[in-house]
């Protein structure tokens, strides 16, 4: 049976932490920045973690070798 490929789009958008959680960059910082407050922009910096069924599905189906 051939190896399963990881989806390229998922490789670019998600990364796995050492504990197995999915790290994701915050959405909403591409355009229309003028209308947002400084506090909103500050809170959009950095990364967040995906939890729950969404994270499990991404790891299982789109990152087959993500967690061994």
From Swiss-Prot:
GO molecular-function terms, A-Z: structural constituent of ribosome
Cited SUPFAM superfamilies: L35p-like
GO cellular component terms given for this protein: cytosolic large ribosomal subunit
Alphabetical keyword list: Ribonucleoprotein, Ribosomal protein
Any single GO BP term: translation
HAMAP family named among the record's database cross-references: Ribosomal_bL35
Recorded family membership: Belongs to the bacterial ribosomal protein bL35 family.
Matching PANTHER family: 54S RIBOSOMAL PROTEIN BL35M (PTHR33343), LARGE RIBOSOMAL SUBUNIT PROTEIN BL35M (PTHR33343:SF1)
Entry protein name: Large ribosomal subunit protein bL35
Gene name of the record: rpmI
């Amino acid at each position: 049976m051939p190896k399963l490929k990881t989806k390229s789009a998922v490789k670019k958008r998600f990364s796995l932490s050492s504990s197995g959680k999915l790290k994701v960059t915050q959405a909403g910082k591409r355009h229309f920045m003028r209308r947002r407050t400084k506090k909103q922009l500050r809170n959009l910096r950095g990364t967040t973690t995906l939890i729950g069924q969404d994270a499990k599905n991404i790891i299982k189906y789109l990152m087959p070798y993500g967690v061994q």
